[in-house]
């Protein structure tokens, strides 16, 4: 048995999830009545995610902000602006795509009983009350807006704390991230249960819905990578951006696609930055920082899946609320780094903007894990390749202003 478990653990998570999906579909189509107990694995998996997600976000944000260092004399300010602007535009693009190609998900009947906010005033009022929520109450009730607010405030307050205090917080953050990793390792079994339950409850049409959702997600990410990002680069360097874009995707994006980790791709990006002849004092800061906060792919995932839930529940969304979602998704995406399935775990934060309960939001997270084999890989490829892309863009824009020749090798 130990040898069997060891062999199973040596198989990549992507392959294990694919196996889980195949088993779930097979059981649901062939012997649904005698294997109904399979669906409990999906419920347990979602329950574990619901339990760990609030604490994860809380400590992760505190640790990141408390350790932020300011005052370095580098080209970092321009890069940070590019990171933030591109992430917001990616989120806005995802919102537009979701309205042009609305996707409906297969949720349980209890998920239909939602009281959505009636207008933008009610949304803002709810948002403000969630911000000032008691931190303990926010953690217990998965009020992610309140959690995010308290985490940011505590992180800022702890920036002047001794290193020992920051190390303790960082260790807590690492420990919770490890727990999340353990939970994610059960994803194949959990997803098997979720797929089984979805097909038994809704039929094979549920898989078609997932296909539509994946098409909107990947289509939006491709648009961001091959249209929006090159446009941002062109406006900064005033020359053909595609040689730089293609090189970043080829030498950074492809690796990130298979590792599915921005953090693991940092050495690749540092080497590529050196090959591009960039300033080491800049890229040694911007690349690790980008792996933390430059999350255009995560912003797309959060926006698309949140609006898929909104369309499913037939909640009316006005222009003001859509813009707030774009900003909120961009901010939330910055907290998705370094965590397996991080962007999916931040979907409840965006869903809370529309009054969608946490249990329904976690069903959407479950759907995200079902399509996560491709979604997470493409998301990471977009995130990580953009780190080098915008670091190089800022460097080349500075050289152009100084009258220096900028030669980009494809």
Curated annotation (Swiss-Prot):
InterPro entries assigned to the protein according to its UniProt record, in alphabetical order: Na-dicarboxylate_symporter, Na:dicarbo_symporter_sf, Ser_Thr_transp_SstT
Record carries keyword Secreted: no
Reaction equations catalysed: L-serine(in) + Na(+)(in) = L-serine(out) + Na(+)(out); L-threonine(in) + Na(+)(in) = L-threonine(out) + Na(+)(out)
Entries under Gene3D superfamilies matching the protein: Sodium:dicarboxylate symporter (1.10.3860.10)
Subcellular location: Cell membrane
UniProt KW keywords: Amino-acid transport, Cell membrane, Membrane, Symport, Transmembrane, Transmembrane helix, Transport
GO cellular component annotations of the record: plasma membrane
A Pfam cross-reference name: SDF
Topology of the protein relative to the lipid bilayer: Multi-pass membrane protein
Record field: transmembrane: 11-31, 45-65, 79-99, 138-158, 179-199, 214-234, 285-305, 327-347, 353-373
Gene Ontology biological process terms in this record: serine transport; threonine transport
Molecular function per GO: neutral L-amino acid:sodium symporter activity
HAMAP family listed in its UniProt record: Ser_Thr_transp_SstT
Family: Belongs to the dicarboxylate/amino acid:cation symporter (DAACS) (TC 2.A.23) family.
Protein's job: Involved in the import of serine and threonine into the cell, with the concomitant import of sodium (symport system).
NCBIfam families from the UniProt entry: PRK13628.1
Name by which UniProt lists this protein: Serine/threonine transporter SstT
Species the sequence originates in: Geobacillus thermodenitrificans (strain NG80-2)
Source lineage: Bacteria, Bacillati, Bacillota, Bacilli, Bacillales
Encoding gene per record: sstT
């Amino acid at each position: 048995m130990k040898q069997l478990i060891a062999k199973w653990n040596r198989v990549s998570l992507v392959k294990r999830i694919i196996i889980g999906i195949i088993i779930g579909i097979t059981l649901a189509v062939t012997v649904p009545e005698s294997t109904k107990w399979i669906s409990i694995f999906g419920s347990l998996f979602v329950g574990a995610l619901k339990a760990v997600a609030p604490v994860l976000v809380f400590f992760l944000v505190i640790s990141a902000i408390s350790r932020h260092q300011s005052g370095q004399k580098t080209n970092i300010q321009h890069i940070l602006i590019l990171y933030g602007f591109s992430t917001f535009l990616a989120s806005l693009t995802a919102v537009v795509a979701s309205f042009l190609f609305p996707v409906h998900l297969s949720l349980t009947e209890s998920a239909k009983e939602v009281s959505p906010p009636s207008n933008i005033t009610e949304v803002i009022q709810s948002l403000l009350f969630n911000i000032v929520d008691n931190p303990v109450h926010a953690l217990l009730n998965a009020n992610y807006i309140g959690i995010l607010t308290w985490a940011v405030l505590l992180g800022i307050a702890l920036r002047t704390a001794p290193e020992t205090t920051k190390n303790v917080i960082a260790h807590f953050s690492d420990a919770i991230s490890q727990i999340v990793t353990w939970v994610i390792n059960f994803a194949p079994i959990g997803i098997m249960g979720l797929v089984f339950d979805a097909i038994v409850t809704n039929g094979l049409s549920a898989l078609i819905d997932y296909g539509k959702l994946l098409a909107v997600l990947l289509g939006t990410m491709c648009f961001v990578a091959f249209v929006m990002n090159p446009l941002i680069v062109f406006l900064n360097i005033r020359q053909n951006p595609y040689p730089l874009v293609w090189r970043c995707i080829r030498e950074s994006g492809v690796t990130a696609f298979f590792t599915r980790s921005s953090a693991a791709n940092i050495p690749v990006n540092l080497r590529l930055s050196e090959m591009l002849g960039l300033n080491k004092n800049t890229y040694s800061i911007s690349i690790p920082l980008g792996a933390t906060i430059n999350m255009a792919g995560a912003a797309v995932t959060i926006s698309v899946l949140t609006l898929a839930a909104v369309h499913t529940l037939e909640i009316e969304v006005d222009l003001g609320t859509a813009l707030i979602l774009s900003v909120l998704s961009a901010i939330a995406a910055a907290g998705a780094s370094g965590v397996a399935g991080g962007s999916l775990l931040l979907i409840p934060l965006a869903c809370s903007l529309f009054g969608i309960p946490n249990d329904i939001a976690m069903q959407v997270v479950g759907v995200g894990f079902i399509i996560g084999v491709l979604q997470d890989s493409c998301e990471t490829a977009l995130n990580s390749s953009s780190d080098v892309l915008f670091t190089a863009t800022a460097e080349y824009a500075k050289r152009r202003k100084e009258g220096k020749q900028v030669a980009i090798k494809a």
